[in-house]
Swiss-Prot record:
InterPro entries: Bifun_inhib/LTP/seed_sf (IPR036312), Bifunc_inhib/LTP/seed_store (IPR016140), Plant_nsLTP (IPR000528). GO terms for molecular function: lipid binding. Transmembrane segments: none annotated. It comes from the Eukaryota. One of its GO terms (biological process) is defense response. Causes an allergic reaction. It comes from Lycium barbarum. Belongs to the plant LTP family. The keyword Transport applies. This is Non-specific lipid-transfer protein. Coiled coil: none annotated. Plant non-specific lipid-transfer proteins transfer phospholipids as well as galactolipids across membranes. May play a role in wax or cutin deposition in the cell walls of expanding epidermal cells and certain secretory tissues.
Length: 51
């Protein structure tokens, strides 16, 4: 679904060279923006299971 695609995009962008990405800060961004993402943003997130 769309969330899985978004998740994959986040991980791909991170892997492509956002050096020093702070996943603790990244994980908190959706809440600061008033958006609820039902999965954790981290390198170990399995995007195929995100719905």
């Amino acid at each position: 679904g769309p969330l899985g695609g978004c998740c994959g995009g986040i991980k791909k962008s991170a892997a492509a060279g956002i050096s020093g990405i702070n996943y603790g800060i990244a994980a908190g961004l959706p809440g600061k923006c008033g958006v609820n993402i039902p999965y954790k943003i981290s390198p170990s997130t399995d995007c195929s299971k995100v719905q």
